[in-house]
């Protein structure tokens, strides 16, 4: 079938900000789709609210709208651009839900817009729990016994009939939001209440739990001619009961017999044909390990996280081909871009094994509930490729960057028996390490299978790894065992520990027997056809398939898995750096291990190595490629941390030298540099012990800001107001010693300002100055950033430009740097300098039209800013106003405190842009998912230090028609200022308390500032958590509340009676 010529313009809906359950995989899918449609000659209009994505670059579509993905804004874009069709299946759950909303509101009919890929009936059949169950019954496909419920009474009735445990699956939600396994009435009440709130159609499916069955996924494709094929089948190591996004996954499946494989393959193809999906689809199935019985769990009628994994695991570009199928092309007429000779209907064949391990953010959230269930909690994932499951698994473990280079975690090895049993029977994020610890202590694989229902095959493979460990320890420096260990995926670092030598000694031992990895190509066809894909993985075999080209090359280190503090912004910079290297005439090589991202799409770079970002693995690639040098500025802290080891091995680090990077990151060296440059910073010192920290804090005066040196994302950072709190921090948050000092600074409560700049060593370009709405003390990644800065005087701006220029040249920065300042009146202090790309670089690149990573890379390669066409100094400011608003995933992470402070908590960001600050903020808030009520009730409960400021806010809220509710202390302050307020009871008082009002939906906004002490038993924690669970916006900073208020004021009209001044409002009390 030829492609359709009756449509000219296609609207692609993106997935919005990164949240748990919907991450960088949709930037990858959206980028592929936009380019694929443009390649076919269509005019592409894109809407997405996330500025940190490649897909929102101007080159990706004919028209790019960085606007909220809401019915209001998408309808406006449709009316303006008049697309012939929309493609919603590449924007995750956001895209699907948006298409359903547009249809229900009549917009698609009104504007005559067709839905491509998967029609709305199919989306409804797959997403609506009742329609899906009916379709499966029609097809004769088994689904677990279930019932659709809309309230708690219906849930009780179902449980009475079939008993516990039951699984709750809300309709139309993402990453299992609001769902879970319930073993008793208390869990049922919590989960069903949450699920009904989060489901846009107030509907949940309650089903009999089949926890313990094997979970298997099939990634399938179908075209308009009803050709259908399987791209990849994957097996979850964890059985049913743990969300697939939180499971360790292997591809292809390892434990299915041919009969089982074919049975489930046929079911998957039958389902995609019945749904008449044109494009990609993910089918999840549960298989009884003791029979051929199976159940269909669910179907995602769209490109998903699993599609990204399947694409990278096989090399088959699902999203790219799904876009082509959506416009009428068929699988047998689209060439497979990997081989260039075969067509897309050939099912990929793998002659290797792929392992995926999720990456969690529990290092950031110590209070979080780490237990895994049907609601996803991972922020990202890593993938590794090997010739055996053992090799792929160990490579994936060391890709995680959790301080483990092997299946060995101190906490697991030192755990007492009770903890070990609990961690094995009730899975948490680190269960793999506890399984290894149990095997080391002599538990059998049969015992572990009984407790976990993990297939014996995987446990046997794990036990073989432990056995090999023992043989390694018993035979130091044995060459045969060394070769066997390397083939099984063991790292040099772990072998060095076993043999009590340093890592270099292991390397020398391998060099003596020429024991080095070779690189194999990922080609989709197990070498059956000729292939030239520049996509490689390492293994210890004979034949090497990667050859060095005659062209000079540059290696760019990626940023690894997505986690809080190091998100998709760094992948964005990596991709732009690669493009700049190619433009400069070099071969660009990427090393990375994140299957979700654009950088690991093999068509981006000249060569892609899918490898762990460890010194050993990176050095092997460098030895084979012999590059001109390595770029570490764009891979976040991951890449920066490798620079020292690489330089010691004689590798040229391009851009800012290692010594100068250290001068910016090492406290004492940085202080000396500031002294020479005569740039002020808040008073502070480095402490190497608890006593020293107390002395420093006493000298400079509380409050103080304490943090370990060398951190990204403000990890273990806190504002401390007393000696007692400082002792608590020093003993609980950090392991302080001379090797790992702690920084103690005077806390300046001023206005925080952030600058990204590019330096060629002589000239310094500052694309823009951003101010934060929240004052210093809230992490820059969690603050609302505004460009151009609205509250800075000309003098302050000039000072910032002067200091930035002096810092860049004084620290010999070549490439990018990010500086954070705090402004107190007209005084400017420097807080920190990061000699690398930053979280704000994509945002600033988009709005100033200066492609920062691209320009910085050209500078790193030796060009200067003036020759590249840039004038040094501050670039001319734009007329429009842009805001970057953080987005949080608190709904997924129960028991995490939502209060903002120096430790970063946001998972993503959105952008708002308009002609006034209020309009830009409105767009930003709406895009971030904040519900903006024009009237309602504000609950104020603030710390004593904030009461004076809260009075002004309350007056303004009252003026535009909001009712004010407050707890006793805050209410008294407001009453004294003659503000009408309803006093509510605190938690624990026996009458109706503020928690009841929150639960009953009587509150529309909560403003709650932190009393000192972070322990969750405090009332504030409960207020904040309840608000999140009930979908009520919470401000833990008065600055954020003031920003929301500004927006509401700009949307309201003045309503005053002519004789208003004569009448005093009575006080009311609830």
Curated annotation (Swiss-Prot):
<feature type="binding site">
    <location>
        <position position="832"/>
    </location>
    <ligand>
        <name>Mn(2+) 4</name>
    </ligand>
</feature>
<feature type="binding site">
    <location>
        <position position="820"/>
    </location>
    <ligand>
        <name>Mg(2+) 3</name>
    </ligand>
</feature>
<feature type="binding site">
    <location>
        <position position="284"/>
    </location>
    <ligand>
        <name>Mn(2+) 1</name>
    </ligand>
</feature>
<feature type="binding site">
    <location>
        <position position="832"/>
    </location>
    <ligand>
        <name>Mg(2+) 3</name>
    </ligand>
</feature>
<feature type="binding site">
    <location>
        <position position="298"/>
    </location>
    <ligand>
        <name>Mn(2+) 1</name>
    </ligand>
</feature>
<feature type="region of interest" description="Carbamoyl phosphate synthetic domain">
    <location>
        <begin position="547"/>
        <end position="929"/>
    </location>
</feature>
<dbReference type="InterPro" id="IPR011607">
    <property type="entry name" value="MGS-like_dom"/>
</dbReference>
<comment type="similarity">
    <text>Belongs to the CarB family.</text>
</comment>
<feature type="domain" description="ATP-grasp 2">
    <location>
        <begin position="671"/>
        <end position="861"/>
    </location>
</feature>
<dbReference type="InterPro" id="IPR033937">
    <property type="entry name" value="MGS_CPS_CarB"/>
</dbReference>
<dbReference type="InterPro" id="IPR005483">
    <property type="entry name" value="CbamoylP_synth_lsu_CPSase_dom"/>
</dbReference>
<feature type="binding site">
    <location>
        <position position="169"/>
    </location>
    <ligand>
        <name>ATP 1</name>
    </ligand>
</feature>
<feature type="binding site">
    <location>
        <position position="752"/>
    </location>
    <ligand>
        <name>ATP 2</name>
    </ligand>
</feature>
<feature type="binding site">
    <location>
        <position position="300"/>
    </location>
    <ligand>
        <name>Mn(2+) 2</name>
    </ligand>
</feature>
<feature type="domain" description="MGS-like">
    <location>
        <begin position="930"/>
        <end position="1070"/>
    </location>
</feature>
<feature type="binding site">
    <location>
        <position position="300"/>
    </location>
    <ligand>
        <name>Mg(2+) 2</name>
    </ligand>
</feature>
<dbReference type="InterPro" id="IPR011761">
    <property type="entry name" value="ATP-grasp"/>
</dbReference>
<comment type="pathway">
    <text>Pyrimidine metabolism; UMP biosynthesis via de novo pathway; (S)-dihydroorotate from bicarbonate: step 1/3.</text>
</comment>
<dbReference type="InterPro" id="IPR006275">
    <property type="entry name" value="CarbamoylP_synth_lsu"/>
</dbReference>
<feature type="region of interest" description="Oligomerization domain">
    <location>
        <begin position="402"/>
        <end position="546"/>
    </location>
</feature>
<comment type="function">
    <text>Large subunit of the glutamine-dependent carbamoyl phosphate synthetase (CPSase). CPSase catalyzes the formation of carbamoyl phosphate from the ammonia moiety of glutamine, carbonate, and phosphate donated by ATP, constituting the first step of 2 biosynthetic pathways, one leading to arginine and/or urea and the other to pyrimidine nucleotides.</text>
</comment>
<feature type="binding site">
    <location>
        <position position="777"/>
    </location>
    <ligand>
        <name>ATP 2</name>
    </ligand>
</feature>
<feature type="binding site">
    <location>
        <position position="298"/>
    </location>
    <ligand>
        <name>ATP 1</name>
    </ligand>
</feature>
<feature type="binding site">
    <location>
        <position position="746"/>
    </location>
    <ligand>
        <name>ATP 2</name>
    </ligand>
</feature>
<feature type="binding site">
    <location>
        <position position="707"/>
    </location>
    <ligand>
        <name>ATP 2</name>
    </ligand>
</feature>
<dbReference type="InterPro" id="IPR013815">
    <property type="entry name" value="ATP_grasp_subdomain_1"/>
</dbReference>
<feature type="binding site">
    <location>
        <position position="834"/>
    </location>
    <ligand>
        <name>Mg(2+) 4</name>
    </ligand>
</feature>
<feature type="binding site">
    <location>
        <position position="298"/>
    </location>
    <ligand>
        <name>Mg(2+) 1</name>
    </ligand>
</feature>
<feature type="binding site">
    <location>
        <position position="832"/>
    </location>
    <ligand>
        <name>Mn(2+) 3</name>
    </ligand>
</feature>
<keyword id="KW-0464">Manganese</keyword>
<dbReference type="InterPro" id="IPR036897">
    <property type="entry name" value="CarbamoylP_synth_lsu_oligo_sf"/>
</dbReference>
<feature type="binding site">
    <location>
        <position position="129"/>
    </location>
    <ligand>
        <name>ATP 1</name>
    </ligand>
</feature>
<keyword id="KW-0436">Ligase</keyword>
<feature type="binding site">
    <location>
        <position position="284"/>
    </location>
    <ligand>
        <name>Mg(2+) 1</name>
    </ligand>
</feature>
<keyword id="KW-0665">Pyrimidine biosynthesis</keyword>
<dbReference type="InterPro" id="IPR016185">
    <property type="entry name" value="PreATP-grasp_dom_sf"/>
</dbReference>
<protein>
    <recommendedName>
        <fullName>Carbamoyl phosphate synthase large chain</fullName>
        <ecNumber>6.3.4.16</ecNumber>
        <ecNumber>6.3.5.5</ecNumber>
    </recommendedName>
</protein>
<feature type="binding site">
    <location>
        <position position="284"/>
    </location>
    <ligand>
        <name>ATP 1</name>
    </ligand>
</feature>
<feature type="binding site">
    <location>
        <position position="780"/>
    </location>
    <ligand>
        <name>ATP 2</name>
    </ligand>
</feature>
<keyword id="KW-0028">Amino-acid biosynthesis</keyword>
<keyword id="KW-0479">Metal-binding</keyword>
<dbReference type="GO" id="GO:0044205">
    <property type="term" value="P:'de novo' UMP biosynthetic process"/>
</dbReference>
